[in-house]
Amino acid sequence: MNSNASNTPIAIGISQIFPCSYLDGQQEQLLVIQEETLDPILFDRLLAIGFRRSGSAIYKPRCPRCSACQPIRLPINEFMPSKRQKRTLAHNRDLTWRMTSEHTEAQYALYEKYIRERHFDGPMFPPSKSQYEQFLFCHWLPPTFIEVYDGNRLLAVAVTDTLPNSLSAIYSYFDPDEERRSLGSLLILLQCRLAKLQDKEFLYLGYQIDANRKMSYKRLYRPYQILTPQGWEYSQVC
């Protein structure tokens, strides 16, 4: 693959086949960019062809017998919150939010609580600081943290990459004791708002996996586009 920015070839490797962490009985294989450092412009273009970031690794599913992972993005200028999403915004008007590049102990403490209480049956349990940092941080692209507060108490965090043409939602977590606030939905809505404020064209939400209930919520934000073999296509779901 060549970079349009520099016309320099980019090395791409392929992983071994291993059990899928999202769908029972399926096998997973990844295309992996084998470069120590990437230009943000190039990474934006890689997002547009279905790649994703985990730590400093840039990957894309290339599974032998499955195509369940569908890259999904929101065209920001067309996004319209649903009635339920508007209620979520109204219900949380008492909260404040801010952007920061600072990584804090409070952020990690909230992440640890979230994983222990919400994902104790998943591959990220038990949580550890080293796992957290390897998963979220990238030496060539420091993430932005969108923090949500109730007074001085941190309630939720969205880890977000800022690219020239887009934002990319890396991971979100929140206080499980505040489930009534729909903080996961609020974080996506705040990322949409931030993308609009920064004049970005898209918010990338990662991969939509219809067969995994925990990964199917992304279709609730409309209109959205799914990357197909023919390119990005708008959803036909009403």
Swiss-Prot record:
It catalyses: N-terminal L-glutamyl-[protein] + L-leucyl-tRNA(Leu) = N-terminal L-leucyl-L-glutamyl-[protein] + tRNA(Leu) + H(+); N-terminal L-aspartyl-[protein] + L-leucyl-tRNA(Leu) = N-terminal L-leucyl-L-aspartyl-[protein] + tRNA(Leu) + H(+). GO terms for molecular function: arginyl-tRNA--protein transferase activity; leucyl-tRNA--protein transferase activity. PANTHER family: ARGININE-TRNA-PROTEIN TRANSFERASE 1 (PTHR21367), ARGINYL-TRNA--PROTEIN TRANSFERASE 1 (PTHR21367:SF1). The keyword Acyltransferase applies. One of its GO terms (biological process) is ubiquitin-dependent protein catabolic process via the N-end rule pathway. InterPro entries: Acyl_CoA_acyltransferase, Asp_Glu_LeuTrfase, N-end_Aminoacyl_Trfase, N-end_Aminoacyl_Trfase_C, N-end_Aminoacyl_Trfase_N. Keywords: Acyltransferase, Cytoplasm, Transferase. GO terms for cellular component: cytoplasm. Functions in the N-end rule pathway of protein degradation where it conjugates Leu from its aminoacyl-tRNA to the N-termini of proteins containing an N-terminal aspartate or glutamate. The lineage of its organism: Bacteria, Pseudomonadati, Pseudomonadota, Gammaproteobacteria, Alteromonadales. SUPFAM superfamilies: Acyl-CoA N-acyltransferases (Nat) (SSF55729). Transmembrane segments: none annotated. It is an enzyme of class 2 (transferase). Belongs to the R-transferase family. Bpt subfamily. This is Aspartate/glutamate leucyltransferase. It is found in: Cytoplasm. It comes from the Bacteria.
